[in-house]
From Swiss-Prot:
This is Phenylalanine ammonia-lyase 1. One of its GO terms (biological process) is cinnamic acid biosynthetic process. The gene is PAL1. InterPro entries: Aromatic_Lyase, Fumarase/histidase_N, L-Aspartase-like, Phe/His_NH3-lyase_AS, Phe_NH3-lyase, Phe_NH3-lyase_shielding_dom_sf. Transmembrane segments: none annotated. The lineage of its organism: Eukaryota, Viridiplantae, Streptophyta, Embryophyta, Tracheophyta. It comes from Prunus avium.
């Protein structure tokens, strides 16, 4: 169908054929936009990861993705850029058209005219005009020291270079193909021009920062680049380093404008931000499921019918992912028995941070997915001005440089990130609070003496700090527009500013995710310790009960023998960490509740209590004294066995689908179980996880947790 359309109208500039831009059944592009959102978010993340790991990014102008931008931006794996040779003819055609129109005396914006509000000025010195354009746009400030922090991060610059090449390859901009080849050489040799961090409103594109790439290409004396080893290079040294011996470019008419008049810096940074955001969003769903496991939550909050009745796809998928993690979980099975045994031990319903986590995360996933597709459309767009339409022999004066999709998408993404962080903080706060966490110790303290172990108290304070800053960053950027450039640029997108703020938000969410994951691993190990200690206490109480309560002084069966079952119920129902640091203390609940059982049995013993040989009261002292001798030793032995890796009860996490993340933290990263008895601090362990998240090492463990999921909820039955 596309081929027939081409024959009918013949419109073709470069790599993008005009009929493809105007599909008859979808003239407004809504259908294409909707099509990109088909399938699950998990499948989309898997596709992103696969693309990110490919060794080559082939640019043709119309199929660049955010994952490819992220891959080139990091350069960690040595990914290379290749330009589609098929785009050369279209690029050359638009460049030739500009030169032809110049020779014919055609009046074209930015070619024979001034710029913006001063476009009423005229000149025939096209090359000199481009040189002046780059000079006056070099208005950024870097500061005199490396610590000044006024240079755009080099990853963002690399992303911008790639996106700008992709735009210019489409053949609507009037620039030579050779210039794009040189920018590609810079990328492939890891030589990155220095761009100012601030100074763009992303409305006539990212004029100021992009002018520094043009300055490097033209050899401006103030241009600097950074080499692969961090060395500072002048423009001449940069050209020599990448093997370009033909000298700097003398820009032809329109070429300077083609380089600077686009949204590549904002959309490039937005691409890297969204790649990370999609990974973190998926991680937040898994962390919510692990939170449900260690909190002994009720899994019915993931039931598909609940979410199907709400209709929102993000919510349905978030619930289905959590349902998959919890399905068959050993923690869930154990918690179910606990709830059946004592339904009044905790509230009938879990608190909102657990129970409504799919409803909370679902809309954020939807926002992130839509923003991802919006930015992918932007990085594959032609976004400068004027556009050269060779087929109709005209220059189109419009406003595709307006980066509103970037500003809006980044504002929305940042709000979604803040919401994810808010949920994470609420979950963390429940996890460390012994009033809410169903038997875990206060602050997740793992040591023997809680008076000398305050666990994650400092980490909770840090989480509050992270969350507060994240909520502040959620405020929109796009409502702070100022009229610029003599009121010509009177509305502007602030796309790069919003992207920068979203990059900050992503960094903070990484801090929160790493801290929360370390805390969850601590909680997993505490549940393991709890189970072993409870087992030890039960066995010890049972042994002591049999020795002291079964028979009387003459070997006859004693009425107190019937107390054992109720004594063991006390052990099952009492939170281990409420007494385990001093299990036989009279002020702790274990001894109080055990004595209460014996007293209650004694009160129902009737006339037998008057006889010393049948009195249960007479047995209490013997039971307690022997327990006080034996129990502390047994508890210490159980702790020692756990520390040496020979615990009597294995860690339930090994039977769970969430195990890959736990294994990654404990084994691959070496982040340890924390106690006040050790020197290691929480921050040191969180740092290991944070670094792994930043380096992308956590991606595989995340996907391993969801291996085998078919993309659908469990059937309703």
């Amino acid at each position: 169908m596309a081929t027939n359309s081409i024959k009918q109208n013949g419109h073709k500039n470069g790599s993008v054929e005009l009929p493809e831009l105007c599909i008859k059944k979808d003239p407004l592009n809504w259908g294409v936009a909707a099509e990109t959102l088909k399938g699950s978010h998990l499948d989309e993340v898997k596709r992103m990861v696969a693309e990110y790991r490919k060794p080559v990014v082939k640019l043709g102008g119309e199929s660049l993705t955010i994952s490819q931008v992220a891959a080139i931006a990091t350069h960690d794996s040595g990914v290379k850029v290749e330009l589609s040779e098929s785009a050369r003819a279209g690029v050359k055609a638009s460049s030739d058209w500009v030169m032809d129109s110049m020779s014919k005396g055609t009046d074209s914006y930015g070619v024979t005219t001034g710029f913006g509000a001063t476009s009423h000025r005229r000149t025939k010195q096209g090359a000199a005009l481009q040189k002046e354009l780059i000079r006056f746009l070099n208005a950024g400030v870097f500061g005199s020291t490396k610590e000044s922090g006024h240079t755009l991060p080099h990853q963002a610059t690399r992303a911008a270079m790639l996106v700008r090449i992709n735009t210019l390859l489409q053949g609507y901009s009037g620039i030579r193909f050779e210039i794009l080849e040189v920018i590609t050489k810079f990328l492939n040799n890891n030589v990155t021009p220095c761009l100012p961090l601030r100074g763009t409103i992303t409305a006539s594109g990212d004029l100021v920062p992009l002018s520094y790439i043009a300055g490097m290409l033209t050899g401006r004396p103030n241009s600097k680049a950074v080499g692969p080893d961090g060395q500072t290079l002048s423009a001449a040294e940069a050209f020599e380093f990448v093997g370009i011996n033909s000298g700097f470019f003398e820009l032809q008419p329109k070429e300077g404008l083609a380089l600077v008049n686009g949204t590549a810096v904002g959309s490039g940074l937005a691409s890297t931000v969204l790649f990370d955001t999609n990974i973190l969003a998926l991680l937040s769903e898994i962390l919510s499921a692990i939170f449900a496991e260690v909190m002994q939550g009720k899994p019915e909050f993931t039931d598909h019918l609940t979410h199907k009745l709400k209709h929102h796809p993000g919510q349905i998928e978030a619930a289905a992912i959590m349902e998959h993690i919890l399905d068959g979980s050993s923690y869930v099975k154990a918690a179910k028995k606990l709830h059946e045994q004592d339904p009044l031990q905790k509230p009938k319903q879990d608190r909102y941070a657990l129970r409504t986590s799919p409803q909370w995360l679902g809309p954020q996933i939807e926002v992130i997915r839509y923003s991802t597709k919006s930015i992918e459309r932007e990085i594959d767009s032609v976004n400068d001005n004027p556009l050269i339409d060779v087929s109709r022999n005209k220059a189109l004066h419009g406003g595709n440089f307006q980066g509103t999709p970037i500003g809006v998408s980044m504002d929305n993404t940042r709000l979604a990130i803040a919401s994810i962080g808010k949920l994470m903080f609420a979950q963390f706060s429940e996890l460390v609070n012994d009033f809410y966490n169903n038997g875990l110790p206060s602050n997740l303290s793992g040591g023997r003496n809680p008076s000398l172990d305050y666990g994650f108290k400092g980490a909770e304070i840090a989480m509050a700090s992270y969350c507060s800053e994240l909520q502040f960053l959620a405020n929109p950027v796009t409502n702070h527009v100022q009229s610029a450039e003599q009121h010509n640029q009177d509305v502007n997108s602030l796309g790069l500013i919003s992207s920068r703020k979203t990059a900050e938000a992503v960094d903070i969410l990484k801090l929160m995710s790493s801290t929360f994951l370390v805390a969850l691993c601590q909680a997993i190990d505490l549940r393991h310790l709890e189970e072993n200690l409870r087992n030890t206490v039960k066995n010890t109480v049972s042994q002591v009960a049999k020795r002291t309560l079964t028979t009387g002084v003459n070997g006859e069966l004693h009425p107190s023998r019937f107390c054992e079952k109720d004594l063991l119920k006390v052990v099952d129902r009492e939170y281990v960490f409420a007494y385990i640091d001093d299990p036989c203390s009279a002020t702790y609940p274990l001894m109080q509740k055990l004595r209460q059982v014996l007293v209650e049995h004694a009160l129902t013993n009737g006339e037998n209590e008057k006889n010393a040989s049948t009195s249960i009261f007479q047995k209490i002292v013997a039971f307690e004294e022997e327990l006080k001798v034996l129990l502390p030793k047994e508890v210490d032995s159980a702790r020692a066995a756990l520390d040496s890796g020979s615990a009597g009860v294995p860690n339930r996490i090994t039977e769970c689908r969430s195990y890959p993340l736990y294994k990654f933290v404990r084994e691959e990263l070496g982040a340890e179980y924390l106690t006040g008895e050790k020197v290691r601090s929480p921050g040191e362990e969180c740092d290991k996880v944070f670094t792994a998240i930043c380096e992308g090492k956590i991606i595989d463990p995340i996907l391993d947790c969801l291996e085998g999921w078919n993309g659908a909820p469990l059937p309703i039955c």
